[in-house]
Amino acid sequence: MGRLVLLSVSDKTGLIELARQLVEEFEFEIISSGGTAKSLQDAGIPVIKVGDYTGSPEILGGRVKTLHPRIHGGILARRDVPQDLKDLDANNIRPLDLVVVNLYPFEQTIAKDNVTVAQAIEQIDIGGPAMLRATAKNFAHLTVLCNPKYYQPYLEELRQHNGETSLAFRQKMAGETFALTNAYDQAIASYFASLTPEATENPLPTRFSVAGLELQSLRYGENPHQSASWYQSGTQPTGWTAATKLQGKELSYNNLVDLEAARRIIVEFDRSEPSCAILKHTNPCGVAVGTTLAEAYNKAFNADSMSAFGGIVALNQPIDPETAKALTKTFLECVVAPGCDEEAQKILSAKSNVRVLILPDLRSGPKQTVKVIAGGLLVQASDDALDNPETWQVVTEKQPTPEMMAELLFGWKVAKHVKSNAIVVSKNRTTLGVGAGQMNRVGSVKIALETAGEAAKGGYLASDGFFPFDDSVRTAAAAGITGIIQPGGSLKDKDSIKAANELGLVMVLTGMRHFLH
């Protein structure tokens, strides 16, 4: 008899190649069930069906297949404990050498629209996690593979160790497996927490944990003396872990942080309107809407071309040749878009070091933000609230035209993604100046206006927080600003409104603050 492997996978990537090499090169016998067994048989690979091996048929519509002593005994038996081996012999159980399992796609299922609880429940794997955990527990004696990316490393282990695996490799695979089952259970727990009546008032669970599988070791963190890694949250690639990198150097920690900030800004703009955001150090230095994608990029770049050098570019439409030509005219770190046509890709390849990423679903982002503090975590719902202009208040004598409201809305969308205290000066739905991260609001106002220069005349000013005094309003008016949008809520709102009326400005209060720290 050859060595025994159990194969039971939902993701069949690399399955046939692995199975064929196990059988032909290393003389394994395969136990399998359900769709996995059928795939192997269709490929002409010999399979022992689980039901034939255990003597028990699948029951309950396939809910019970591998939960059997002949399976779990073969996994959990300690090969160096005589009584365990006697138990195997007494019960006609063969020890397993390898277990290859991946799990039902629970997270992919609940991510779909209009999924019912009944549909979600059917994608909660029971037998898979049981086998994975059992094998990982007994890593001293057998190997577990929970992801197709480990198939080739496993085969190399066999070749390097005369058909065996090293203890270090088995222990590493056990650790990866426990991390996977932890993340899987966390996803299920989070889903059920979201179903409770309290979830509508407080969408955060009473127990919050963070789990991730290392996707890539990064060269360093924010600075060269800081180590860093990139982890995939959950069991399935989503967001940036599902993005395609068309070209360019390896992504850095800072690249990924900036890319996520860029993604958050660009999804504020409807895909029907070509839009571009350019960032440095997570703050936008140029954001614009255009009639074409190339125009949107050029407007955003020219808004602050000095800061845009070496920036991160986010586009809300697929890259076309005209936009690609514009992108190659200067040094950029990264470009992200929902797509890129073949001709555009050829043009971009002239700048081979530029990292070009394709993220079709730009709107797929985290529902919470997490900060680590000494002794704990701070978790909050992401600031994804959609502002409703119909609820805004025009508090000045001068009333805005529809065109002015569109300009104010543009600036407001950008200000939401600037570090507080945040001020954005814009015109023609293009940023002209951004004041970020100042300790007093009027300081940010002055920086934004200074960057805008003479172009500020006839422009608009957006503030992520209220004005504690009327000095910001007066400074803006002196530079030629015609309209201001801010949340309101200051004890001295009346002073700012009075100043706006005196100076002939439009002022709109949104009633919603957007601090960003």
Curated annotation (Swiss-Prot):
Reactions catalysed: (6R)-10-formyltetrahydrofolate + 5-amino-1-(5-phospho-beta-D-ribosyl)imidazole-4-carboxamide = 5-formamido-1-(5-phospho-D-ribosyl)imidazole-4-carboxamide + (6S)-5,6,7,8-tetrahydrofolate; IMP + H2O = 5-formamido-1-(5-phospho-D-ribosyl)imidazole-4-carboxamide
Underlying gene: purH
GO BP terms in the entry: 'de novo' IMP biosynthetic process
GO cellular component term, pick one: cytosol
Pathway(s) per entry: Purine metabolism; IMP biosynthesis via de novo pathway; 5-formamido-1-(5-phospho-D-ribosyl)imidazole-4-carboxamide from 5-amino-1-(5-phospho-D-ribosyl)imidazole-4-carboxamide (10-formyl THF route): step 1/1; Purine metabolism; IMP biosynthesis via de novo pathway; IMP from 5-formamido-1-(5-phospho-D-ribosyl)imidazole-4-carboxamide: step 1/1
UniProt keyword terms in alphabetical order: Hydrolase, Multifunctional enzyme, Purine biosynthesis, Transferase
NCBIfam families for this protein: PRK00881.1, purH
Pfam families per UniProt: AICARFT_IMPCHas, MGS
Keyword Lyase tagged: no
GO molecular function (one): IMP cyclohydrolase activity
Record domain MGS-like: where: 1-146
Annotated organism of origin: Gloeothece citriformis (strain PCC 7424)
Name under which the protein is recorded: Bifunctional purine biosynthesis protein PurH
Domain note: The IMP cyclohydrolase activity resides in the N-terminal region.
Homology family: Belongs to the PurH family.
SMART domains reported for this sequence: AICARFT_IMPCHas, MGS
The protein's Enzyme Commission number: 2.1.2.3, 3.5.4.10
